[in-house]
Design a protein with these regions (language model features):
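Positively charged, polar, low-complexity stretches
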Residues: 1-93
Length: 93
C-alpha cells in the first residue's frame, strides 16, 4: 500500500471532489471482477471514486484497505459510502 503525505492527500482530495464514482461494490463484496474493474480504472485515471453499498463503516474501511493492498494503491479518503483511491500511472504509459 502506498503512503501519502498530508499535503499530497489534501491535493488529491481536491482533485477528486468533482469526480463521479466509476465502480460500485454491492452485496457480493470485493469479487475478482470488481478488483479487476478497479484496476482498469486506476490504470486509466489514476484517481477514482468507488461507491460501496454497505452500511457498516468498519467493513467499508476494511474494503478500502483491501483494495489498496491488492492493487498497490493509496487510500485518499473515505467519506460516507464513497472511497477515493489513487495509484500513480505506470512509468511506461
Amino acid at each position: 500500500m502506498l503512503k501519502l503525505s498530508s499535503d499530497e492527500r489534501r491535493s488529491l482530495r481536491a482533485r477528486a471532489h468533482g469526480l463521479n464514482p466509476v465502480v460500485a461494490i454491492a452485496e457480493n463484496g470485493l469479487t475478482a471482477s470488481v478488483v479487476n474493474e478497479i484496476d482498469v480504472n486506476l490504470k486509466a485515471h489514476e484517481l477514482i471514486k468507488v461507491r460501496v453499498f454497505n452500511d457498516d463503516r468498519d467493513e467499508r474501511e476494511a474494503l478500502l484497505a483491501s483494495i489498496c493492498e491488492l492493487l498497490d494503491a493509496a487510500p485518499v479518503q473515505h467519506i460516507g459510502k464513497l472511497l477515493v483511491v489513487w495509484r500513480p500511472a505506470p512509468a511506461d504509459a
